[in-house]
């Protein structure tokens, strides 16, 4: 961890590999400062890792980076111990949170952090970059809550890119809060909802049997992507309803 003018810079890194006996080992498990990583009890061939926030933030001016790589034969599940709370800092600059995920052939990554809460007065840019081999499997969940109870949201910019076998499959950006383009909270945007989320599901079997595009209950939709992948998007009045929508849509894909 380093402290620079205006904020903290910290990173965490996880590398998982198949052990050749049907299990998964973690040769790299590194974190610093506000980004602590802990191995927890896994199940079967799966290794589980928890991101633990050792400090509050990100605050204005902070820059956090997290990387996870599921190498050949690995089964890796990554979660977080609590929600991430973006807060304003003494520095008026925005904060950054960059996530880079890589999954090799015959490997699987479940990326399931808790919600990101954009507190009033905060300014956070989140980028998630995912690179998958042709035979990789992925479940990625993103959930954003705009403001705490009774509070207007901060400014939140979130971009997600997905590449499979070197080919771009998804590149989308969400901008909410002060300074966002007009209409972000209108009928064509979030329509007054304060929780928004998505799932990206990549399974080789989707190449021959892609899921059908459909509405899943009120506020959620399932869409096939141009690859062995599906995207679930949802909006809801609160984090609890959002999670229920995403979980239900995921179950419908099985």
Curated annotation (Swiss-Prot):
It comes from Streptomyces coelicolor (strain ATCC BAA-471 / A3(2) / M145). It comes from the Bacteria. UreD, UreF and UreG form a complex that acts as a GTP-hydrolysis-dependent molecular chaperone, activating the urease apoprotein by helping to assemble the nickel containing metallocenter of UreC. The UreE protein probably delivers the nickel. Transmembrane segments: none annotated. The gene is ureD. This is Urease accessory protein UreD. It is found in: Cytoplasm. Belongs to the UreD family. Keywords: Chaperone, Cytoplasm, Nickel insertion. InterPro entries: UreD. GO terms for molecular function: nickel cation binding. GO terms for cellular component: cytoplasm. Required for maturation of urease via the functional incorporation of the urease nickel metallocenter. Pfam families: UreD.
């Amino acid at each position: 961890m380093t402290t620079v003018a205006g904020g903290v810079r910290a990173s965490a890194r996880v590398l998982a590999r198949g052990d050749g006996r049907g299990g998964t080992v973690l040769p790299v498990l590194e974190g610093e400062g506000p980004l602590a990583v802990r191995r927890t009890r896994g199940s079967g061939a799966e290794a589980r890792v928890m991101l633990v926030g050792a400090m509050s933030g990100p605050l204005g001016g902070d820059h956090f980076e997290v990387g996870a790589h599921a190498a050949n034969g690995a089964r890796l599940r990554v979660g977080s111990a609590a929600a991430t709370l973006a807060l304003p800092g003494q520095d008026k600059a925005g904060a950054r949170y960059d996530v880079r995920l890589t999954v090799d052939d015959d490997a699987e990554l479940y990326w399931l952090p808790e919600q990101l809460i954009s507190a009033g007065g905060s300014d956070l840019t989140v980028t998630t970059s995912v690179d998958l081999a042709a035979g990789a499997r992925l479940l990625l969940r993103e959930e954003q809550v705009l403001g705490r109870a009774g509070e207007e949201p901060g400014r939140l910019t979130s971009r997600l890119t997905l590449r499979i076998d070197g080919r771009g499959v998804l590149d989308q950006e969400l901008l909410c809060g002060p300074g966002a383009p007009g209409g972000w909270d209108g009928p064509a945007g979030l329509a007054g909802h304060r929780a928004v989320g998505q799932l990206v599901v990549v399974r080789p079997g989707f190449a021959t049997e892609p899921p059908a595009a459909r509405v899943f209950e009120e506020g959620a939709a399932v869409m096939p992507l141009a690859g062995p992948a599906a995207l679930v998007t949802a909006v809801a009045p609160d984090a609890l309803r959002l999670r229920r929508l995403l979980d239900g849509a995921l179950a419908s894909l099985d």
